[in-house]
Amino acid sequence: MMFTAGLAADILFYSFCEWILYANDPHIAEMGSMQIWSSTYPIFHWGPIPWSFYLVLAVAFGFMLHVRGCHKQKYSEACRPILGNRADKLPGKGIDLLALFALLAGTATTFSLATPLMAQVLSRLTGLPSSKWVTIGILVVTCIIYTYALVHGMKGISRLSAACMYLFFALLAYVLLAGGETRYILETGFSAIGNLAQNFFSLATFTDPQRTTSFPQTWTIFYWAYWMVWCVASPFFIGSISRGRTVKQTILGGYVYSLGGTFLSFLILGNYSLGLQVSGKLDVLGIYGGAGDLYSTIIAIVDTLPLAPMVLVLLIAAMIAFYATSFDSIALVASSYTYKQMTGD
């Protein structure tokens, strides 16, 4: 549940196409090989640093809930050592309101990124024109699924999370084994991980002080801000489901499962589409340059797979499951902000 709650459908959207956004960037050209750096930066931006945002806070919140026995799951409660009794008054309420607004902004950002892709996939499968009504229909279906899981409590969320993982790994396995780029995916993936390990600190501290390309401002800082917005929800949820686990188990479990799933997604889906470009089987950059549309570019990538309609069905089902699971965790956290005091589990 850590993985599915911490990431919405954005991971599938960006896994296919993030390297495309980097490929023609002047900063990538400065660094050398487009192939290696375009596959390295996605796992850097979605890798150890952002997951550490979640896990460090999850440990703190889990300690507050399960060891200290705190019955208030709010950011204002975490500020009580500083605010004192004012955590229950206007300053504390202001902090909780800011957290809720940040949560709504993060949710809106997530919907705006991946929902148009689902609408185009559905349009492609059914022949219906891609319109706002198709998008609304997708949102309604997603809301029905996550509401059904939510009313069944943690058991419902757990089952939905398991279904999400089955769909997710089925998609990855099919692309890896049936796409015809298995060797390239594996070799480029290992190269990207090694390149990240070798250059991790230089990537993390590069600020482009002369603004020659503004790459870190455009991408790296944007991603850190994007992940920090979700820190108002995901760490609380991870902390709440980590009852009975040690600090070591929470952190290592989060890194092994969540970071592992993230890396697999980018290294398989991203390197598959990159392999198509490098081998000349599909001019991915040309399609994106001509259309200026990542959504149609992703569909063109999926069309190169055997049984492409089946893959599109699997893709949209996995994205809906990711959305529903993520929003279940958000709903639980948002509702906890509204309680004066929580009782029971």
Language-model features, listed with the residues they occupy:
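Extracellular/periplasmic helix-exit of transmembrane alpha-helices
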Residues: Y14-P26, V175-N195, N199, L259-D293
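Flexible loop linkers connecting adjacent transmembrane helices
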Residues: M1, I20-Y41, M64-L90, L276-P306, ...
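Membrane-interface loop-to-helix entry segments
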Residues: I95-A99, L103, T109, V151-A178, ...
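Membrane-interface helix-loop-helix modules in multi-pass membrane proteins
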Residues: M1-K72, L252-Y255, G261-L274
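Membrane-water interface regions at transmembrane-helix termini and the short interhelical loops
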Residues: M1, S39-W46, A60-H71, Q120-L125, ...
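Transmembrane alpha-helical segments of multi-pass small-molecule transport proteins
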Residues: T126-V151, A170, W224-F236, D345
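Hydrophobic, membrane-embedded alpha-helices of multi-pass small-molecule transporters
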Residues: F3-E18, I49-H66, L100-F111, V134, ...
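Hydrophobic, small-residue-rich membrane helices and short re-entrant helix-turn-helix hairpins
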Residues: K74-L90, Y148-F168, I185, F222, ...
